[in-house]
A protein has these predicted regions:
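Ligand-binding grooves and catalytic loops that recognize ribose/phosphate and carbohydrate rings
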Residues: 55, 60-63, 69-76, 80
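Conserved long hydrophobic alpha-helices within structured protein cores
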Residues: 34-38, 71-102
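Ankyrin-repeat intra-repeat helix-capping/turn positions
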Residues: 11, 35, 69, 105-106, ...
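Leucine-rich solenoid repeat scaffolds
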Residues: 2-14, 20, 128-158
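Conserved ankyrin/ankyrin-like repeat signature
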Residues: 15, 39, 72-73, 110-114, ...
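Ankyrin repeat domain, specifically the short helix-to-loop turn at the C-terminus of the second helix
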Residues: 18-24, 42-50, 75-83, 114-124, ...
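Ankyrin-repeat boundary/"N-cap" motif
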Residues: 1-6, 23-30, 52-64, 87-104, ...
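Hydrophobic repeat-domain scaffold segments
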Residues: 23, 30, 36-42
Length: 158
């Protein structure tokens, strides 16, 4: 995993800013996680299969874009063939894009839009992540009744 993603995962904003100030050439995972759509588009133009790659830590670009709240990056990945129901390959977490969207940090409106986008692209509202945790469980854990209602309307089991 890159230093940049490690800093992002750790919430170390100063380190993230320091690393980004050096204007690094972002890989597909970093571009997705930071919502750098121009770089993401460039990487996908070079090799469309990157939309479905997995990072060393097991996450995929779509899950990163969703978790970190980048709707345009998520839409770009979906439009370029990212598998909306692909589970990350980490041993314990195994999340899909819909799980990441429903659990995303940030405001409810952003989570709602990301969940809606994933569902519009065929996300399974009942797909369990590792341990059986479902997207609706994430919405309930966040107290996000709007996302919970959307999931129920799209077939999530209560």
């Amino acid at each position: 995993m890159s230093d940049l993603l490690q800093a992002l995962y750790a919430g170390d904003r100063d380190r993230v800013d320091e690393l980004l100030a050096a204007d690094p050439e972002l890989d597909v995972f970093e571009a997705a996680a930071f919502g750098r759509d121009d770089r993401l588009r460039e990487l996908l133009d070079e090799d469309p299969s990157r939309a479905n790659e997995f990072a060393d830590d097991g996450f995929h670009p779509l899950g990163l874009a969703c978790f970190f709240g980048h709707r345009d990056a998520a839409r770009l990945l979906l439009d370029r063939g990212a598998d909306v129901n692909a589970l990350s390959t980490n041993e314990h977490v195994q999340t899909a894009a819909l799980h990441a969207a429903a659990a995303a940090a940030g405001d409810e409106a952003m989570r709602y839009e990301l969940v809606k986008l994933a569902l519009e692209h065929g996300a399974d509202p009942n797909l369990p992540q590792g341990g059986g945790f479902r997207p609706i469980d994430a919405a309930r854990q966040n107290g996000d009744s709007r996302v919970e209602q959307l999931l129920l309307e799209r077939g999530a089991e209560g």
